[in-house]
Amino acid sequence: MTVNDATRKLVRQRANFLCEYCHSLEEASAAKFAIDHILPQSLGGSDNPDNLALACQRCNGYRYNFTTGIDPQTQEVIPLFHPRKQKWSDHFIWSTDGLRIIGVTPTGQATCNRLDVNDERHNEGSIVKARRLWLQGGWHPPEEDPRQQT
Ligand SMILES: [Zn+2]
């Protein structure tokens, strides 16, 4: 029931040391990232690498045992973004200033909402403040991520 060290290493490297939900960089964060079970163990999810993702403490905490979120535009219940089966850039973009994640599909929007990826409901936007510093440091956002066009 515990993920072994070799698997942890694989998950970290595969994720390029980024949270697979909010693309925070582990090195720039105070807390070590968690190995997230995409289908939670409480719902029968396995320790197979196909069911694992690297997640920062905030995303891991907000995701908890949830596998769905609400699309704020339609109020529909939508499965959360699945880092193994879906591609981040198909569902999310960065705002022009690189500080906020914008969901561009129902999956993206439901995930942004559930994980509060821009700290709009919690922490007084502290993740946005951290991103501003990372941006100044040249670590953020990841180069391959799309940004909103003006
Ligand atoms: Zn995260």
Outline where the language-model segments fall.
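Histidine-centered catalytic micro-motifs used for acid/base chemistry in nuclease
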Residues: A34-P40, C56
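Short beta-strand-alpha-helix junction that forms the catalytic/metal-binding core
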Residues: C19, L43-R63
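Short edge-strand/loop segments of extracellular domains
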Residues: I38, L43, P72-T74
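Right-handed parallel beta-helix
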Residues: Y21-H23
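Active-site-adjacent scaffolding segments
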Residues: F17-L18, A28
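Flanking scaffold residues of small Cys/His-coordinated metal-binding clusters
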Residues: R14, A30, D47-N51
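Extended charged
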Residues: M1-A6, L10, L25-A28, D50, ...
